[in-house]
Amino acid sequence: MNPGPSAAIDDELWALVLGLQRHAAVAGAAPTEPVAYRLEPRWGLSPLQPDEHRGAVLIQDPDGRWRCGPALAKGRRAAARPLLRLYLPLFSTTLAPGWTVAHLGQSLDGCIATHSGDSCFVTGVENIRHLHRMRALADAVIVGAGTVVSDDPRLTTRLVPGPSPVRVIIDPMRRLADHYRVFQDGAAETLLCCSHEHAGARVRHGQAEVVPVATKAGSLDLIGLKSELRGRGLRRLFVEGGGVTVSRFVAAGAVDRLQVTVAPVLIGQGRPGIVLPRVSSLSEALRAPAQVVAMGEDTCYELDLGTARSRPDANSGSKSESKSGSI
């Protein structure tokens, strides 16, 4: 598959996001008053004087959050504003210690692949390009062993400008052979995370480093895994799949933002996306602030799970007045 040019965000605006990434890496605390910035072709973000705010592409508020400036309100740039809202929160000072974003692409009936595991590709070119951008913004991209077997992914940023992240493969029992591309191509640093029991004496798996992680209830302790990665300076984590891995991260409360991109296709009895423990009533369901972004023919739903966990009424929602469904 060869994704074509993106209609939603062009090279100039992606350069803006990468400029913000460089700026955030060296910036200090949030400003005491709003600060507006323009994009300099050679130098990245440059602050503006208060009387120049009309030309601002980005504004940082005293709460540390970023928003689109007036210069992105009209013309072709305006079409990119919804998509930029997926990226701007990642540079907020409230997420400065690090963030974990999980993503799944699925069919309208909730499947990420056919029953045989064919998943290339459920979503369209816009979402594939978005995945590569998210990799470029992350320190590490995380996938489970099932994704490696089904897709043999490279997990690089070959479709967009930007650095490829460290590749983290979760394989608790170390069952994967070492012939997959992530273990052999040398395109990026790669970590194979498994249990202490299965780490063995070998410290390498192909070209990947073997990293033993504590287990919990038969699976890797994901909070412990995140701690191990933080100790290596990997604080911005992108969990790219598959359904089992993303579901476990969500169930463990280890995800700040969850992105689910839905394609207008019906797969039938395929492999499910998010699978969480059962709840008895809708009042127990996880409800979170959300935004919706169009990606070509697909629709991306992003849930702010970090905010949902911090709200005492996060799981409360409207209930029907009767069992008949009347409201």
Label every model-predicted segment.
Residues 1-327:
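Enzymes that bind and transform nitrogen-containing heteroaromatic metabolites
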